[in-house]
């Protein structure tokens, strides 16, 4: 995550949308722990077909949510999308030009298509194995500004 933390766009950002990682995603839990008191970090909470945003004030305040993703369930709803400076987005696959394949429910595409996100810098975090040359694009798909490819550790038995 140091690659991300060294980016000027991250250093300038005050309000950051990020995700609490699942086991098969680039890990963000240490990042959340390190930055939750220095920057305003927002995490998505699944509510029906939409993602609500809530502030992550401390890792200990997170609970397993609907999809077994850690969520700040007891924090107030965040609605000031226009104040978000940076969005860090997970995915299953990415292309070098910013296309993203999610898990198929469209949660992030619906969230990021909100006009308030138009000026938000969007970064996808990927392992090298998640990079592909091309992905199908639907009209509702939101393209990312940058893909950061982070090293992974593979254990082989």
Can you say where each PLM-predicted feature lies in the sequence?
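N-terminal active-site beta-alpha-beta segment that forms phosphate/nucleotide-binding
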Residues: 1-82
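Conserved phosphate- and dinucleotide-binding cores of soluble alpha/beta proteins
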Residues: 52-157
């Amino acid at each position: 995550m140091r690659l991300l933390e060294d980016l000027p766009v991250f250093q300038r950002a005050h309000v950051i949308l990020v995700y609490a990682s699942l086991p098969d995603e680039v890990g963000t839990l240490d990042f959340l722990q390190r930055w939750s008191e220095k920057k305003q970090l927002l995490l998505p909470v699944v509510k029906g077909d939409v993602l609500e945003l809530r502030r992550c004030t401390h890792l200990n305040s997170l609970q397993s949510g609907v999809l077994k993703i850690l969520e700040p369930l007891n924090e107030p709803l965040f609605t000031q999308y226009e104040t978000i400076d940076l969005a860090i987005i997970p995915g299953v696959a990415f292309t070098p030009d910013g296309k993203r394949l999610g898990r198929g429910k469209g949660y992030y595409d619906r969230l990021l298509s909100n006009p308030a996100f138009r000026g938000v810098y969007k970064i996808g975090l990927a392992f090298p194995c998640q990079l592909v040359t091309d992905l199908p694009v639907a009209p509702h798909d939101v393209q990312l500004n940058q893909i950061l490819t982070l090293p992974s550790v593979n254990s082989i038995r």
